[in-house]
Amino acid sequence: MSSTPFADELLATVQASPAAVGAHDKDTWVGLFATYGQVNDPVGSRPHIGEAAISKFYDTFIAPNTIVFEVENDVVAGMSVLRDLTIHTTMSTGVTMRIPMHLRYDVVEDGPASSLKIDRLFAYWELRAMISQLLGAGSDGLLASAKLGPQLLKNQGLNGVLGFMRGLKGVHDAGKQRVQELAAALGARDVPTVTTLLSPEASLSLDGVSEASLAEFASGASSLGVDKLLAAGSSVSATVCLGDRRGVGLFEFSDNSAAPGTLASVQLYF
């Protein structure tokens, strides 16, 4: 992680989010976002854009729960902060959910004072796995499920419920398998196979900031290791390593029908 003062300021901006969540300080949490900020939680669901929508998101998913952030690693790359973590969410019925997650915060300078604000928050976690965990938690889990539905409908409306459930769609296990195939091909220095796994105009980066050519990427990521793969929407996030460096990788699949199942973007953050 960069040790420059500006990187420290970016990280402090991001760390204010779990602090406000833990304190149940809605005004502070909502105020961390830029004027037209957005929350994608989970990635693949309909984003919550603007103060009113973010406020309703807080009322639905944060206010009724006790949420603890267990952060394992932070990476600052350009104006983005990536977090590798597990979230422990205790619902009103007492059931606690353990949710493996990667977070990406895109930060901007916003307002007359050019204060650092969160422009976009992307939460990569698996909605299907969370629902399975909740339903498998016995009577407390079933009761929590029964309460969550009306909460969603009250705060988000029918369209909001449908937008949230969009998070159930996506690349799932097939996407995670494709990412593992990419890592294996890179490790074998099998550039032809790497090429078949990427869409023709794939965006590649070894640091989440600078674009890399296919040759540069294949050479620089030849020892890429991937772990903790999470499928969210059309993306897979992963804990990645190169040598002794640990970071977060974001793998975005193409929506181009001419290149089905290929990766449109591979961004590695260290």
PLM-predicted stretches and their roles:
Residues S2-F270:
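C-terminal and inter-domain tail/linker signature
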